[in-house]
Amino acid sequence: MAATMMGVATQTREETEPEAEPAGPDIRQYVVVDRSLGMSAGKVAAQVAHASVAALLAGTQRYVEGDPTCGPIGLEWGGSLARTSVDAGVLAEWVRQGEPKIVLAVDGERALAALVSRAESRGFMEGMDFFCIRDACRTELTPDASGSRWTCVGFAPMVVSAISPVTGQLPLYR
């Protein structure tokens, strides 16, 4: 109900705020970085960015190649409707929640490998649920025998309760 102050009608806060949408499950995207590499802040940011977009780009690539299991995300790319392997409902809720990302840390490639092993033991698949990011070593890092360096693992956006058994014990990257 509008209140009157000095002859001017005003609306109460309850009248002007839209009703909050019901809260969906917490959805986050996790990226786990190997901090033992001593990357600069800019290099870490670039590697996390690669990991963050990998889920959408990998799914989009599968759609372009004709994989019918990818769900629509409503983006046009190359004249086609882009699709991703991320569940459309999860993706929509993640976007609604502000696309939250959490960056965690491990120390060393063995720790990254252990993380991948935990993920696979829970049924997660590389190239669909998580992405191993390797740097081309053109700027800061020294390549390993493969000619690149494994820097991080990025997970597709997912319900926190699904990913917590894999990442829950890891510290935040600082």
Residue ranges, per PLM feature:
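Positively charged, small/polar-rich N-terminal and surface patches that mediate targeting and assembly
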Residues: M1-R174
